[in-house]
Amino acid sequence: MFFFQMPRVPELLFSAWNFRAGARSLLRTSRAGTFTPEDLSRYRAAWAQPGAVTAMINWYRALFRYPGSFRVGRIEVPTRILWGRKDAFLHSSLAGVSHRQCTRAELIWFDQATHWLHLEEPEAVNSALIGFFSTPATP
């Protein structure tokens, strides 16, 4: 994340060689077969839009520039957290942090899933979400 604090350099490296770094990152951090060549072409087309890469990187820049801005109170509404244990970007301990931030939360682990849980386990994710949204909340 410190790398993203530099001006322009992250954008140049991410965009170089037809967004090779971005495509490799998707492939390295997901289960085999998650991203097809067609998927990668679509990502490259999206990344090529003016300002897209800077917008993505600015999220990480803001974490360091405005650290106090991201404080959130307790989450009081029913919450279901879905988490891939093999997430290369978000350490599994953050799932517990998120869970403790909620007064009524359920944490569901996906042992073989990565950061791309919704792409790797779409049926299970959809089932978990439909079940959650179909259940009336209790006060």
Residue ranges of model-derived segments:
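Flexible "cap/lid" subdomain of the alpha/beta-hydrolase fold that forms the substrate-access gate
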Residues: M1-W109, I130-P136
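Catalytic histidine-centered segment of alpha/beta-hydrolase-like enzymes
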Residues: A113-N126
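Short, intrinsically disordered terminal tails adjacent to the first/last structured region
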Residues: S127, T138-P139
